């Protein structure tokens, strides 16, 4: 199982602003966002891990040991035409979460919210970096990739998080689940990436992703 430990050299302040719901707050102090991004970067302990499996798109089954039957129509549609899937997990560690909690407890609400948003941007950025590292390896084997899809997207139930934790071997980087199926450390993700051969799924790269694929039209973090 490949492990990804590339450092975060910076955190995208525009993404942190978006996650904080400040896209329309043009007069908000940009320096505070940049400060939150830098504080987060210094505390981050970025780690990622991934594993590749054969996939049967007809039955929505990941051929692991034991096999994993994916539930939900949306994930099945998303992985249509895929021969393999990559199960991945990424985290920026616990130190950020502890600092955010400390700031809330001491009444530093604004900085805590901004740091929470920066941490979300950081873990997504980490996962983006993993995808970029994976892509050429898969391309060398004749595969293109779809964008990552996580439990909770569409109708893919959070109840399948334990399966994804197992498939990605996420506990090896310290990512676990609470009894309510939430990831810990909180700024962590799990996801599947579908792999397909272009002649079998020539339009896959044009399928909607992220905010464009989400039904929450009024989300304050929605990309413009």
Give a label for each model feature.
Residues 1-115:
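Active-site helix-to-loop segments that bind/position phosphate- or nucleotide-bearing substrates
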Residues 28-31, 35, 121, 125, ...:
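Conserved active-site and cofactor/substrate-binding residues in soluble primary-metabolism enzymes
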Residues 37-44, 134, 138, 215:
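Structural signal for hydrophobic packing residues in well-ordered secondary-structure cores
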Residues 70-77, 103, 108, 132, ...:
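Sparse, context-dependent recognition of short Cys/His-centered cofactor- or disulfide-binding micro-motifs
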Residues 92, 141-220:
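Short terminal or interdomain "cap/linker" segment that borders an active site or interface and mediates
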Residues 108-168:
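Internal, well-folded beta-alpha domain core
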Residues 222-224:
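Short Cys/His-rich "knuckle" micro-motifs
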């Amino acid at each position: 199982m490949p492990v990804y430990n590339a450092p975060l050299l910076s955190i995208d302040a525009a993404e942190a602003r978006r996650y904080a719901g400040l896209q329309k707050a043009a007069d908000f102090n940009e320096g505070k966002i940049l400060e939150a991004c830098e504080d987060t970067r210094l505390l981050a302990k970025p780690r990622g891990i991934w594993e590749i499996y054969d996939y049967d798109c007809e039955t929505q089954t990941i051929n692991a040991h034991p096999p994993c039957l994916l539930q939900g129509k949306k994930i099945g549609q998303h992985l249509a035409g895929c021969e393999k899937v990559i199960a991945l997990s990424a985290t920026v560690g616990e130190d950020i979460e502890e600092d955010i909690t400390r700031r809330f407890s001491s009444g530093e609400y604004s900085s805590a919210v901004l740091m929470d948003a920066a941490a979300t941007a950081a873990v997504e950025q980490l996962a983006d970096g993993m995808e970029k590292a994976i892509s050429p390896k898969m391309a060398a084997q004749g595969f293109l990739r779809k964008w990552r899809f996580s439990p909770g997207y569409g109708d893919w139930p959070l109840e399948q998080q334990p399966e994804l934790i197992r498939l990605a071997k996420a506990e090896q980087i310290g990512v676990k689940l609470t009894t309510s199926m939430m990831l810990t450390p909180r700024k962590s993700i799990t996801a599947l990436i579908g792999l397909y051969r272009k002649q079998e799924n020539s339009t896959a790269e044009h399928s909607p992703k992220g905010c464009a694929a989400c039904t929450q039209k009024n989300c304050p973090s929605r990309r413009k």
